[in-house]
């Protein structure tokens, strides 16, 4: 299924049913009085977070979501049937905005979270309500109210504990494949990963976390170079970023400049994202002699004046990945997840 993380949709709640103008008519009761029933309330439109839904692609084909109208009231004090609510499943991590005002309407995080995005109109009143000591045969009723209608923007931000950063071909997809059951496409050309991938990393039977891989960034991504920064939003809910660095790039590029380019793109996209905890992960150490790999890693650390955690791994050979995953689990358990 195609991955879609943004959609626009119009929602229309049902109108309330009109009140009924009716009088009791029975044999031997010539003046039975009013017996008009109320209309039914209009149905509302709800979004519900559903863990079986992974993308907003359905909204590309269904741009109008409409709940049922309430039915009009009837004689003999019978109320009209309420319009049926429209319940629409959306992925966990869906944020809903008013398209015109950009107002945040709600965030659906946990399975079962429910958000009313258009409320149904109230029912109209039958003429029974307007009977009084001075008006025994009222001919007054009220109309049902119109249901709410609005244009919405839906945005999906994946729910993950750890996010992967790096240039194309840094080895992010290989890493997530090595430590989880995720199966992203892996090859030796740029932009193999075209859409975000999630993987569940289990360090023990009951200890696990979710890791997100997004398409690689390149310098100028904020201006639209490469695949741009459109997928960075999927890292905004993470607790920690792993910056995967290729220490043996085939094109001979400078890893320090590559790291600085990624940091620059992060800062231009979001200060909040750029300030998240970030660990450096030097990948592909198996391609260099141990002493050369050690010297190159230390040179990068010195030039960056890096003070944070550093790991040296070979994702393809699963070298150093187990320790990294256990340390990630410990970090996440110490710093309880907050979205």
Swiss-Prot record:
This is GTPase Obg. It is an enzyme of class 3 (hydrolase). Residues 127-147 are annotated as: Disordered. It comes from Coxiella burnetii (strain CbuK_Q154). GTP binds at residues 166-173, 191-195, 213-216, 283-286, 314-316. Keywords: Cytoplasm, GTP-binding, Hydrolase, Magnesium, Metal-binding, Nucleotide-binding. An essential GTPase which binds GTP, GDP and possibly (p)ppGpp with moderate affinity, with high nucleotide exchange rates and a fairly low GTP hydrolysis rate. Plays a role in control of the cell cycle, stress response, ribosome biogenesis and in those bacteria that undergo differentiation, in morphogenesis control. GO terms for biological process: ribosome biogenesis. Its main location: cytoplasm. Monomer. InterPro entries: G_OBG, GTP-bd, GTP-bd_Obg/CgtA, GTP1-OBG_CS, GTP1_OBG_dom, GTP1_OBG_dom_sf, OBG_GTPase, P-loop_NTPase. Residues 1-159 form the Obg domain. GO terms for cellular component: cytoplasm. Its EC number is 3.6.5.-. GO terms for molecular function: GTP binding; GTPase activity; magnesium ion binding. Its cofactor is Mg(2+). The gene is obg. Mg(2+) binds at residues 173, 193. Belongs to the TRAFAC class OBG-HflX-like GTPase superfamily. OBG GTPase family. Residues 160-333 form the OBG-type G domain. It is found in: Cytoplasm.
């Amino acid at each position: 299924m195609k991955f879609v993380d943004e959609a626009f949709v119009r929602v229309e709640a049902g109108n309330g049913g009109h009140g009924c103008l009716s009088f009791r008519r029975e044999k031997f009761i010539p003046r039975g009085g009013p017996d008009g029933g109320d209309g039914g309330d209009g149905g509302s439109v709800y979004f519900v977070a559903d863990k079986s839904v992974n993308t907003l692609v359905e909204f590309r084909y269904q741009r109008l979501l409409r709940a049922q109208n309430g039915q009009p009231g009837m004689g003999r004090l019978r109320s009209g049937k309420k319009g049926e609510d429209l319940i629409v499943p959306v992925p966990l991590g869906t944020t809903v905005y008013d398209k015109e005002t950009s107002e945040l309407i709600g965030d659906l995080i946990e399975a079962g979270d429910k958000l009313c995005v258009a409320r149904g109109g109230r029912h109209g009143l039958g003429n029974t309500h307007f009977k009084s000591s001075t008006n025994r045969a009222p001919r007054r009723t009220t109309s049902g109210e119109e249901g709410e209608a609005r244009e919405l923007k839906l945005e999906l931000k994946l729910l993950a504990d750890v996010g992967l950063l790096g240039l194309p071909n840094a080895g992010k997809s290989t890493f997530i494949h090595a430590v989880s059951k995720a199966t992203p496409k892996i090859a030796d050309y740029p932009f193999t990963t075209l859409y975000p991938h999630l993987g569940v990393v289990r360090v023990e039977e009951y200890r696990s976390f979710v890791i997100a891989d997004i398409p690689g960034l390149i310098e100028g991504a904020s201006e639209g170079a490469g695949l741009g920064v459109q997928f960075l939003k999927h890292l905004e809910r993470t607790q920690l970023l792993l910056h995967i660095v290729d220490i043996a790039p085939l094109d001979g590029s400078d890893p320090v400049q590559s790291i600085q380019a990624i940091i620059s793109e992060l800062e231009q996209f979001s200060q909040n994202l750029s300030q998240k905890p970030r660990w450096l992960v030097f990948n592909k150490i198996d391609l260099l002699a141990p002493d050369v790999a050690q010297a190159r890693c230390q040179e990068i650390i010195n030039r960056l004046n890096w003070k944070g955690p550093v790991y040296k791994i070979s994702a393809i050979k699963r070298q150093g990945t187990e320790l990294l995953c256990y340390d990630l689990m410990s970090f996440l358990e110490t710093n309880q997840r907050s979205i």
